[in-house]
């Protein structure tokens, strides 16, 4: 039995307590300063309000002020915060980690330097830990298609554990692997993490299609708009492969679980797709974001960071002006709040051509209360 401390009681970190508990491990779930009500619910009833289900009896809940007790004797630590809280989590871990611990990050995104250089989030997390201690910690991450509600419901889920030490990955896989939680390993740490960030960008773009159909007044038409979706999905896969080469990852990682697998499930629904639909229907990004109540959007954040780095990388000659045409277009829409325009003629390695076809203008489509209140646990992260 291993003692595992999970920092952050959001839906994914909490869902991962299920396979761990099923394997008989001592699981300690610690809330952040934003999770007070979640932990209170778990302590009182065992029910996670986001997942809307009871966690295994062996999972123990701790408020943030109890974090030292939760980390006592832990051998594995899971950083369960999202990309917006990575540096905060690193600062907490800096005082809690001990030499020899294994740390797994689940946040998906990247960080850009002033010159446009991009870094994966586990490296950002580790930066907050003093160098001497950092070198005595093993770092890993989880990629692949994984909806939290399905993990908690023990539905078959296939994921990739990535890191630089194969022996550590083997130990982690054995710790987590169950009959329903299937774990593969990869030493392409950078590649898996780049895919984890970029899949959110392209999943958002796939959401445009349904909105475009609504703008055309053909939502009920027998002729759908899957061709549009598939083209953006395919270009997203191409650009993920290009980014892996640029960052030193293995291009083939883009075409497995961590890349197209994760992008597929994220494109199936959720917040990224909902905001994409509203943009496709005629709203600007800021209008769509406001319509959805300014909810956290990891896809939009990733587009702003990664897409925003491209002009600087282009100026330095690191990438060509014709590279990443879809991501550049997404940055115009999300980062600069410009009208939707898809550069069809510049995609799939084609020579750049003058302006492609923009979707026709029309009024925005309303969002129902049911959509706004969609259960976060049962949509892709």
Regions inferred by a protein language model and the residue ranges of each:
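Residues that mark the start of a beta-strand
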Residues: 2-3, 102, 330
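Short beta-strand/turn micro-motifs composed of small residues
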Residues: 8, 31, 105-107, 143, ...
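Rossmann-like NAD(P)(H) cofactor-binding subdomain of soluble oxidoreductases
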Residues: 61-155, 172
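General beta-strand structural signal in soluble alpha/beta enzymes
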Residues: 105, 137-143, 183-187, 255, ...
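NAD(P)-dependent Rossmann-like dehydrogenase/reductase catalytic/cofactor-binding core
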Residues: 199, 204-214, 223, 230-241, ...
């Amino acid at each position: 039995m291993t003692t595992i401390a999970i920092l952050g009681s959001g839906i994914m970190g909490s869902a991962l307590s299920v396979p761990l508990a099923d394997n008989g491990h001592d699981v300690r779930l610690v809330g952040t300063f934003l999770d007070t009500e979640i932990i209170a619910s778990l302590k009182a009833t065992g029910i996670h309000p986001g997942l809307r289900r009871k966690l295994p009896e062996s999972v123990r809940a701790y408020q943030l002020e109890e974090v030292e007790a939760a980390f006592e004797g832990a051998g594995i630590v899971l950083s369960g915060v999202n990309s917006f809280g990575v540096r905060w989590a690193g600062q907490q871990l800096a005082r809690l980690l001990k030499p020899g611990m294994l740390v797994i990050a689940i946040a998906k995104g990247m960080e850009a330097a002033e010159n446009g250089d991009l870094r994966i989030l586990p490296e950002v997390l580790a930066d907050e830990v003093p160098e001497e201690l950092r070198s005595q910690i093993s770092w890993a991450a989880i990629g692949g298609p994984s909806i939290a509600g399905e993990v908690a419901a023990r539905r078959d889920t296939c994921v990739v554990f990535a890191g630089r030490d194969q022996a550590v990955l083997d130990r982690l896989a054995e710790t987590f692997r169950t009959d329903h939680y299937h774990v593969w390993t990869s030493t392409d740490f950078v590649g898996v993490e780049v895919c984890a960030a970029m899949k959110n960008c392209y999943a958002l773009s796939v959401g445009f299609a349904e909105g475009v159909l609504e703008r055309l007044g053909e939502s009920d038409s027998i002729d759908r708009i899957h061709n549009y979706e598939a083209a953006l999905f395919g270009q997203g896969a191409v650009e993920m492969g290009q980014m892996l080469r640029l960052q030193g990852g293995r291009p083939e990682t883009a075409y497995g679980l961590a890349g197209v697998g994760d992008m597929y499930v994220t494109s199936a629904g959720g917040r990224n797709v909902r905001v994409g639909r509203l943009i496709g229907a005629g709203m600007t990004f800021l209008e769509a974001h406001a319509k959805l109540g300014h909810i956290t959007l990891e896809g939009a954040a990733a587009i702003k960071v990664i897409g925003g780095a491209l002009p600087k990388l282009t100026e330095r000659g690191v990438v060509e002006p014709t590279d990443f045409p879809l991501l550049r277009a997404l940055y115009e829409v999300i980062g600069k709040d410009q009208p939707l325009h898809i550069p069809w003629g510049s995609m799939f390695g084609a020579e750049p051509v003058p302006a492609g076809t923009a979707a026709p203008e029309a009024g925005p489509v309303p969002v129902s209360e049911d959509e706004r209140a969609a259960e976060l646990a049962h949509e892709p992260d």
